[in-house]
Amino acid sequence: MKKILPLLALLLCACGQKPAEKPKISIFCDHIWTVARQEGISFREAAAKIREIGYDGADVRVLQDPDELRILDSLGFGHSCAIADIDYGAGEQPEMEAAALAFLETYGYDRLLLVTGLMPEGSTAADRDAARQRIAAFAQRVKDKGFCIMVEDFDNPRSLCYNMAGLDSLFALSPSLGHVFDTGNYLFAGDDALVAYDKFQNRIGHVHLKDRVAPDDMHCVPAGSGCIPIAEIVGKLVASGYNGWLTVEQYGSRQMLADSKAAYANVTAILKGE
């Protein structure tokens, strides 16, 4: 067997087949701003430091300052994902929907994370059903235009995407919706991230790598250094053939630059099988 594997590798190269492409590592643009504030430097300087670490892309918001987008592009950041906060619990949202679509078309992003807002206190089953219908209708519009639209497990009980059951209800209604798999939010909802991965694997189009201190401490720590099975999840993703983006998420960090370096090193080591 040891002799066969190198021969097989040579045959693949001779036939022009390249090794499977691995996922790329990205970060939230919000985190770049946090670095700028904490280090007392400009957004451009902070973005350059993050790029120097090795991050290849940035998740940005559809209302992001165009100057910031140009800076990211000039430094070589890839367009990992756009994020649209649209409050469907408050009713129809034509203006924000139009803004999200215009952003994708103008700036060349092909993936959209739809953060669906929080349902008002006291909302009824009928209210939730109506909000889901609005989400499904917009998802179909986005897909029809050739973009990927996704929702994520969101760490607030008032979200329609709070847990596996909530996501199930949305996915049953909308075949157009993909999933941004947030590694750290299923624990917040009392669900098992590995069970959720197996359940929603075919929907996953983007990943947020969020780690937590412990099951009873939801503070974020650099991916790969907390209680979330980051290595196992990333291993499953790679084995499945996923070669999209892994976006590091660590809101609340008091040392964002150092934590960004640690997270990048951890995830890189996982991808290398170390």
Regions found by a protein language model. Give the residues of each.
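Sec-dependent N-terminal signal peptides
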Residues: 4-13
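Acidic/histidine-rich catalytic cores of soluble enzymes
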Residues: 144-227
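N-terminal pre-domain/capping segments
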Residues: 15-106, 110, 178, 265-274
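Structural preference for beta-strand elements that scaffold enzyme active sites
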Residues: 24-26, 57, 78-81, 110-113, ...
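A cross-domain feature marking catalytic cores of carbohydrate-active enzymes
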Residues: 27-31, 60-62, 81-86, 114-116, ...
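Acidic-and-aromatic substrate-binding clefts and catalytic sites of carbohydrate-active enzymes
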Residues: 34-40, 57-69, 86-95, 120-123, ...
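Active-site groove signature of glycoside hydrolases
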Residues: 104-124, 145-155, 247-248
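Conserved, mostly hydrophobic/aromatic
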Residues: 50, 58, 104, 149, ...
